[in-house]
UniProtKB/Swiss-Prot annotation:
Family annotation (InterPro entries): Globin, Globin-like_sf, Globin/Proto, Leghaemoglobin-like, Leghaemoglobin_Fe_BS
Cytoplasm as UniProt keyword: yes
Binding site for heme b: S46, K65, H93, K96
GO molecular function list: heme binding; metal ion binding; oxygen binding; oxygen carrier activity
Sorted UniProt keywords: Cytoplasm, Heme, Iron, Metal-binding, Nitration, Nitrogen fixation, Nodulation, Nucleus, Oxygen transport, Phosphoprotein, Transport
Positions of modified residues (Nitrated tyrosine): Y26, Y31, Y134
Subunit structure: Monomer.
Chain's role: Leghemoglobin that reversibly binds oxygen O(2) through a pentacoordinated heme iron. In root nodules, facilitates the diffusion of oxygen to the bacteroids while preventing the bacterial nitrogenase from being inactivated by buffering dioxygen, nitric oxide and carbon monoxide, and promoting the formation of reactive oxygen species (ROS, e.g. H(2)O(2)). This role is essential for symbiotic nitrogen fixation (SNF).
Mod. after translation: Nitrated in effective nodules and particularly in hypoxic conditions; this mechanism may play a protective role in the symbiosis by buffering toxic peroxynitrite NO(2)(-). Nitration level decrease during nodule senescence. Phosphorylation at Ser-46 disrupts the molecular environment of its porphyrin ring oxygen binding pocket, thus leading to a reduced oxygen consumption and to the delivery of oxygen O(2) to symbiosomes.
Keyword Plastid attributed: no
Name of the protein in its database record: Leghemoglobin-2
Location in the cell: Cytoplasm, Cytosol; Nucleus
Chain's gene name: LBII
Amino acid sequence: MVAFSDKQEGLVNGAYEAFKADIPKYSVVFYTTILEKAPAAKNLFSFLANGVDATNPKLTGHAEKLFGLVRDSAAQLRASGGVVADAALGAVHSQKAVNDAQFVVVKEALVKTLKEAVGDKWSDELGTAVELAYDELAAAIKKAY
């Protein structure tokens, strides 16, 4: 069980709303960061076959889904102290053989993207809340393998 406060959930929700304010822009930041850190990750995402394209609805849709899952993770943590991931989500990550290092790259890209999205509203407290929500989501996905 993880203690996650209403305030932490609110911080994560606010960051998600900032991301949603310009999904195409922040999707590009997110996937560009992933590919800078781990170029081979391109092979994990079929929609990156032609590069990072903000007009690609699969790219923006996947980013929105991931960021939404982190927001949902925060809500689950506040409500119950744990996160449960859908078995299908675990299966996809298992099938693609996503490893711990790749989860870390995604977390770093998520944090960088949200930091840019919220601008001067970024704080250590927000960063901690986002990282905790993501880490618990990642653990739940791995558990669902």
